[in-house]
């Protein structure tokens, strides 16, 4: 008896909230999975759909079950709600091109537009500041609430002529936005080589020079030594509260007396604690903003 060798894909779909997107992308990257897309709508920022195409001959039932359970467990670490999942057998679908149709132009605030690199600029957004990104990397493209909070804050407080430092740059979207909103120069840094590569690629996509936006691999301590005595006017850091606490002792060395901090990646419930912690280090809260359960805080040095 001759067994069928028909090739097909297992298409996995999962509806999820945006605050776990970057964790899912990290998991997919660690698993070596590149055939995925995220369907989102600017009109509904609360739900988006992760779609993953898995070759049938490599992913048996047991492997698929482990894959699904890993994603559900990762979600549970952040929130309690149960996610909807679906498996579908797809015959000869060319995911390498079809996944692109699920990405759309994404307006942020009143001025910014995140535009997937292969799309034409829609006429309706022709007056916006366009940031081109390639969603094929292991980093988000601006849909996470904390990233949007940072972009909206840059829009509210454009860094005209300022020197900016972006700690933990990811895709580079915040540094690119800073330049397009008038910053003189941006120094970006990340401890993840994939982030450095993604940022470098997105710098090219946006026709920026290394003089405008430079990115390097390394720690905040490395950056502090590189910048000294050049101080940043604005320091942006979009990461988790425990990480901010680890990085905070270096903030003074990277800044000057009239610099500002823009910190996000915080839960609303953590704002009081992190603000008190930074106050001990000499920083004073100026403003705070929130979206869903996430928050952004702006601080200045506490002058006696």
Curated annotation (Swiss-Prot):
This protein's superkingdom?
A: Bacteria
Tell me its EC number(s), please: 2.1.1.-
Which Pfam families has this protein been placed in?
Answer: PrmA
Compartments where found = Cytoplasm
Give disulfide pairs as residue numbers. none
Which chemical reaction does it catalyze? Answer: L-lysyl-[protein] + 3 S-adenosyl-L-methionine = N(6),N(6),N(6)-trimethyl-L-lysyl-[protein] + 3 S-adenosyl-L-homocysteine + 3 H(+)
One GO cellular component, as annotated: cytoplasm
Where do the TM regions start and end?
A: none
Tagged with keyword Methyltransferase: yes
GO BP of this protein: methylation
Question: Tell me, what is one Gene Ontology molecular-function annotation carried by this entry?
Answer: protein-lysine N-methyltransferase activity
Keyword Transmembrane helix listed: no
Give the similarity note.
Belongs to the methyltransferase superfamily. PrmA family.
What this chain does, per the entry, is described as:
Methylates ribosomal protein L11.
Q: What is this protein called?
A: Ribosomal protein L11 methyltransferase
